[in-house]
Amino acid sequence: ALQWVIDNHEKYRITTINLAPVDDVAHAEPVPTDIDEKLAKLHELGIWVSAPTGNHGYTNGISWPASQPNCFAIGAVKPGNDEVHQDRHAKIVLVVPGAATSSSNAVVCGAVLILREAIEKSGYDWHKDGETLPDAMLKIMQETGVAVADPGSGLTFRRLDLKRALDRVYAAQ
């Protein structure tokens, strides 16, 4: 499926992939797999790829494929408050309200579509924020996100604040 996206992303205007099959194992490091080359190519093409980190409360790793390079690892905070739950590890790049990390990842993929459109319509120069558009969008979302401390892991994560991300993009006009 990833190869199909690589081959057809221009024809069908594919810009975002919600990669949601998880292996439910705590990986502290990437696990070499057959999809790594495809993830690198998608990233190079400017296609956002993210995956949920898992729902086991791990603090020593996250599920595959979120553990892989060129795949952004999305965690969860409890809806209605900023309590990080489910898997919590330093590889998580952004947390989003959701009962499970799969729903958090779906929300961030929708946010990425909106942010990408805002960048295109506003003429925002994303190159100052990253080498690729996915890297730039992640940086924007992290820098405008709300800091959420997790006492259980000792880590601080950034929670998506789409309005602040959009305000940053449109303020640069």
Report residues per predicted region.
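Substrate-binding/access-modulating region of protease and related hydrolase catalytic domains
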Residues: A1-Q68, A99-V107, P151-G154
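Conserved acidic residues
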Residues: T15, F72, D161
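Charge-rich, solvent-exposed alpha-helical interaction surfaces
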Residues: K38-K41, A136, I140, A165-R168
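Flexible loop residues that form catalytic
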Residues: V22, A76-P79, G145
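Hydrolase catalytic cores
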Residues: D7, V96-R158
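Caspase-like cysteine protease fold
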Residues: A149-Q173
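Extracellular S/T/G-rich loop segment that most often corresponds to the catalytic His/Ser-adjacent loop
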Residues: I47, G61-S122
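Short acidic-hydrophobic sequence patches enriched in Asp/Glu that either
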Residues: D34, A66, Q86, D129, ...
